[in-house]
UniProtKB/Swiss-Prot annotation:
This is 3-hydroxydecanoyl-[acyl-carrier-protein] dehydratase. SUPFAM superfamilies: Thioesterase/thiol ester dehydrase-isomerase. InterPro entries: FabA, FabA_FabZ, HotDog_dom_sf. Pathway: Lipid metabolism; fatty acid biosynthesis. It catalyses: a (3R)-hydroxyacyl-[ACP] = a (2E)-enoyl-[ACP] + H2O; (3R)-hydroxydecanoyl-[ACP] = (2E)-decenoyl-[ACP] + H2O; (2E)-decenoyl-[ACP] = (3Z)-decenoyl-[ACP]. Its EC number is 4.2.1.59, 5.3.3.14. It is found in: Cytoplasm. HAMAP family: FabA (MF_00405). PANTHER family: 3-HYDROXYACYL-[ACYL-CARRIER-PROTEIN] DEHYDRATASE, 3-HYDROXYDECANOYL-[ACYL-CARRIER-PROTEIN] DEHYDRATASE. The lineage of its organism: Bacteria, Pseudomonadati, Pseudomonadota, Alphaproteobacteria, Hyphomicrobiales. NCBIfam families: fabA, PRK05174.1.
Length: 173
């Protein structure tokens, strides 16, 4: 049975990255530096915009985060793809948390809009994904809408984030 708490601290997320939270061969988060949040502050199978679940996570922004040194020299900004990846990570975590079996893979999204950027002067990033649909057949597929806020202002919006869980031997095509 998966670990079904509603809050996960950094050490819990690392355990997930090592494959210890949802069992061998099941959903894992990436390990640092690609783990893009410090904690999950809420996860439920109800609620959210569509009433089918929500995941909310936070990243404490520090000027020494690895990507600021290389993206870009003398013009540091968090790559937008990392914020997007964080939302995919959260959908995959939700699928494992809700009992889905298999390894997670991002499968795409419908639409993405950036209206700001995460700078090293920011204090906190909040990510939110609202689960729209979960399909469980040979493939476990989650679809969600998400947003990223920096210091309280929503600056990314993603529609139809898709993540699949694949059992050993099956691969996304």
């Amino acid at each position: 049975m998966p670990d079904r708490r509603s809050v996960y601290e950094y050490e819990d997320l690392l355990a997930c990255g090592r494959g210890e939270l949802f069992g061998p061969g099941n959903a894992q988060l990436p390990l640092p530096p690609m783990l893009m949040f410090d904690r999950i502050v809420e996860i439920t199978e109800t609620g959210g915009e569509f009433g089918k679940g929500v995941v909310r996570a936070e990243l404490d922004v520090k000027p020494d985060l690895w990507f600021f040194a290389c993206h870009f020299k003398n013009d540091p900004v968090m790559p937008g793809c990392l914020g997007l990846d964080a939302m995919w990570q959260m959908v995959g975590f939700f699928l494992g948390w809700s009992g889905g079996e298999g390894r997670g893979r991002a499968l795409g999204l419908g639409d993405l809009k950036f209206s700001g950027q995460v700078l090293p002067t920011a204090r906190k990033v909040v990510y939110n994904v609202d689960i729209k649909r979960v399909m469980r057949s040979k493939l476990v597929l989650g679809i969600a809408d998400g947003w990223l806020s920096m210091d309280g202002e929503i600056i990314y919006r993603a529609k139809d984030l898709k993540v699949g869980l694949f059992k050993q031997g099956a691969t996304p095509s």
